[in-house]
Design a protein with these regions (language model features):
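Extracellular/oxidizing-compartment recognition motifs
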Residues: 1-108, 120, 133-141, 151-168
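Non-transmembrane alpha-helical segments in soluble domains
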Residues: 95, 125, 142, 146, ...
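Well-ordered alpha-helical scaffold segments within catalytic/enzyme domains
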Residues: 123-134, 180-187
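Conserved active-site neighborhood of enzyme catalytic/cofactor-binding cores
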Residues: 143, 156-187
Length: 187
């Protein structure tokens, strides 16, 4: 019929020979509805993966030039010049973690928790300042909490645990908002 679907599933681990794309209670899948013929596609969301598999439904396909477009904090210019290979590996992993978890705001984990959580931000903001000498992402992060007049499902004057995308299910940890005060003091 000239139309079909491509399913791109992905995850950070394999379970046997399979990719369990709902393992993290998320849907780690991109669905493309396409007509027969050549086309290009770009998906712009903060995915993380190590393994990827493509399935087709109602169409034959050939995939060319599949690649990841890197999105994250700019490359960090600070380096650790150490003869200790383990220490160097830890440092490099820390830089990589910072870059993946810092884009427009601080994220707990871009594959699972894409909102900015207070508490995490307190520590990540220190890393941003140490690595870049700036607090630009922290400014954006804190501003998200300051701009709204109120927050749905919270008492007046109280801040959410994470924003955007706080929990509206009655689960609330009040001391999480206190991290805002501690972070704002250092800012």
């Amino acid at each position: 019929n000239g139309e079909g679907e491509l399913y791109i599933v992905f995850d950070e681990i394999m379970q046997g020979d399979n990719i369990n794309f709902t393992r993290l209670t998320t849907a780690s899948v991109v669905i493309i509805k396409a007509k027969t013929g050549k086309f290009s596609f770009l998906s712009a969301e903060p995915y993380t993966y190590r393994y990827i598999r493509i399935y087709s439904k109602n169409m034959k396909c050939t995939v060319n030039n599949l690649h990841l477009l890197r999105v994250g904090a700019p490359e960090v210019k600070k380096v650790l010049d150490s003869d200790n290979k383990k220490l160097q590996a830890i440092y490099n992993a820390a830089i990589e973690t910072y870059r993946q978890n810092t884009f427009d705001i601080y994220m707990d984990c871009p594959s699972r928790e894409r909102a900015g959580w207070l508490c995490d931000s307190f520590f990540t903001s220190r890393v941003e300042k140490a690595l870049t000498g700036k607090s630009e992402v922290e400014h954006n992060f804190l501003e998200n909490y300051i701009l709204p007049e109120s927050f749905k499902c919270l008492p007046d004057g109280m801040l959410p645990m994470c924003y955007p995308a706080d929990h509206y299910d009655g689960v609330y940890i009040p001391n999480w908002a206190m991290w805002f005060v501690v972070e704002l003091r250092e800012y």
